[in-house]
């Protein structure tokens, strides 16, 4: 096992990465190794997808499957080894079908890629795990060095984050051939074990630029189906009655669940990154969407154990449900998996609803505590002139984009302390689950404009980028000249690709934490600092002083 893709990876003087029987996330060495094998199979599939496009062949089954299967290897998504192997077998079957299509056009069609003809050696998981050793990401570290390995992983993990957003967009009916062609090209190239530093750096920026387009079609999918988010108050306390909790990012799953629970007497609560769903008109119209439950994903083993109903996981993040003994009432959807947990293959939630009706639910309603979400792209752009006016009248000094992933590391209290230290004449724009560090606190307003503005899920960084570009255009300056600072927390690969997106768009002087990614060497961090001004957090006092004086 070698896995260094998330923030909680093991760090030692001898090197970084989880390499024992089990990773810090709970992923076993078997599952981790089989995910490496799956990625190799997907690289071979992409190599043939690139070749097929040369012949004008576009296989939509391949395009829809490849990013989805890659998404299953993202942190805290799928811990079920047999399902990972199932994805690998499906990748190979699709590859062979695509290869046959190419050979039908050109009998001499071939692909020069080491993954292009990969076959699984056995049905036995142990044998497959031994085969997977051939594809361990750091297998040639001694030959290429830590810097090249780090850049390869930056590209691989960044592309994995983009694949997750591609799947979210695909579920909502969004498709862009140029994006899929670019994805396959990059995925196939990474399967050749590239070792050119400049080419890898360029690839990382290409991934960032591609992901901006992905976020654009995802935004179009969400707003096209569910309307543009508008500011909405959400209760974060319990309401009496039967209940279901839904977590993850998939708004379509939430919509289907709301439709199927309507009139059943079962209330629905969002959790984690599903909180922004309350801002969408077509979702909040369901009166039994009664609130949001819990805090950051890392607290789920305690909070889920206390929730008196079933739980549905639509995407990341899931962690071991046996710890809180709720594994008999947690359900997985789509690419999510945990051994022994029931999986929903389709859109029918009737079994979950039946379980909810059989459980006690909340016995009484707690005193409501309301927070505000729903500052989507249209709302943000509608406030652009107000922001400019406040800045011109020196009522608004600075905007801090304070967001990203949450996690268990104690140093993450930095983000709570930073938020509460932001001066009263400054505004906090937040997104993603890092907001749970401070989103239940009171921040007041500036002439009626809330000082805490929740822009949505992690992919809604797109809205923040569009706002920044709009403000810069109206003020006749560059984005980096705005009174705007980005302080980002990271945990997994979606955060990595968001960072690459920002860097590829030329955004500079981003501050990140709580630690630097374990796969980035001091040399690589120095390069990113020199090119983009990217740096790690220090202390709240020092960072606040530096950012306000910039």
Swiss-Prot record:
Which organism does this record belong to? Escherichia coli (strain K12)
Q: What is its main location?
A: cytoplasm
Q: How is the cofactor bound?
A: Binds 1 [2Fe-2S] cluster. Binds 1 hybrid [4Fe-2O-2S] cluster.
Q: Which GO terms describe its biological process?
A: nitric oxide catabolic process; response to hydrogen peroxide
Positions of [2Fe-2S] cluster binding? 3, 6, 18, 25
What does it catalyze? A + NH4(+) + H2O = hydroxylamine + AH2 + H(+)
Question: At which residues is Cysteine persulfide found?
Answer: 405
* The protein's role, per its UniProt record: Catalyzes the reduction of hydroxylamine to form NH(3) and H(2)O. Is also able to reduce hydroxylamine analogs such as methylhydroxylamine and hydroxyquinone. Might have a role as a scavenger of potentially toxic by-products of nitrate metabolism.
The family database entries (PANTHER family) matched by this protein are listed as: HYDROXYLAMINE REDUCTASE (PTHR30109:SF0)
> Protein name, please?
Hydroxylamine reductase
Q: Which residues form a coiled coil?
A: none
Q: Where in the cell is it found?
A: Cytoplasm
Where would you find the membrane-spanning parts of this chain? none
Keywords on this record?
A: 2Fe-2S, Cytoplasm, Iron, Iron-sulfur, Metal-binding, Oxidoreductase
This protein's GO cellular component annotations are: cytoplasm
What Gene3D superfamilies does the entry give? 1.20.1270.20, 3.40.50.2030
